[in-house]
């Protein structure tokens, strides 16, 4: 932005499906969305991958583990991602393979909500570690989850529009930032 002071960037946080609709209609030049969206009407490429982590309140018994497995979560109050979330579905498969039944006390579409609830001591949950960074040292601890699962984010653009040089540069800066 400092290299192009006459270019304005508008940042809006919205549900992935809303972002997809705005990009498909040409109202947005690009969007960064969760991988479970319907990609009809947009050009799609993977933007980033982050390994799933288990978020737990500071001082939680699971904090003593180096890695958390599905069986370790059995019986703990679990804050889950929304049922349509790709990562949640993959986690449910991992729990099923391990013979573990997780009964969520809360469901939410956002890792940041899980982090806030975990920091408040409500339970544990699987989160995107990038989203959890502001909570580290503020009541929340992360441990890797095994088997390795990943949050995937997609970069979407209108399919029939060529990206401008400014947009290509901006996308490059976004990729470098993550």
Regions found by a protein language model. Give the residues of each.
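Short loop/turn segments at beta->alpha junctions
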Residues: 15, 69, 109-110, 128
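Short hydrophobic/charged patches on amphipathic alpha-helices used for structural packing
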Residues: 20, 24, 44, 70, ...
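Flexible hinge/capping segments at coil-to-helix
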Residues: 39-52, 56-78, 164-165
């Amino acid at each position: 932005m400092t290299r192009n002071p006459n270019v304005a960037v508008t940042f809006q946080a919205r549900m992935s499906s809303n972002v997809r609709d705005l990009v498909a209609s040409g109202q947005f030049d690009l969007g960064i969305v969760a991988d479970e969206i319907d990609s009809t009407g947009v050009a799609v490429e993977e933007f980033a991958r982050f390994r799933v982590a288990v978020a737990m309140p500071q001082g939680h018994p699971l904090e003593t583990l180096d890695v958390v497995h599905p069986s370790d979560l059995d019986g703990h109050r679990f804050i889950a991602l929304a049922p349509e979330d790709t990562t949640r579905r993959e986690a449910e498969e991992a729990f099923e393979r391990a013979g573990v039944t997780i009964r969520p006390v809360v469901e939410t579409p956002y890792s940041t909500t899980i982090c806030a609830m975990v920091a408040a001591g409500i339970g544990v949950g699987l989160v995107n570690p990038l989203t959890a960074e502001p909570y580290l040292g503020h009541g929340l601890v992360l441990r890797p989850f095994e088997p390795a699962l990943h949050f995937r984010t997609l970069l979407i653009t209108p399919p029939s529009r060529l990206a401008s040089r400014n947009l290509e540069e901006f996308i490059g800066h976004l990729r470098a930032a993550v």
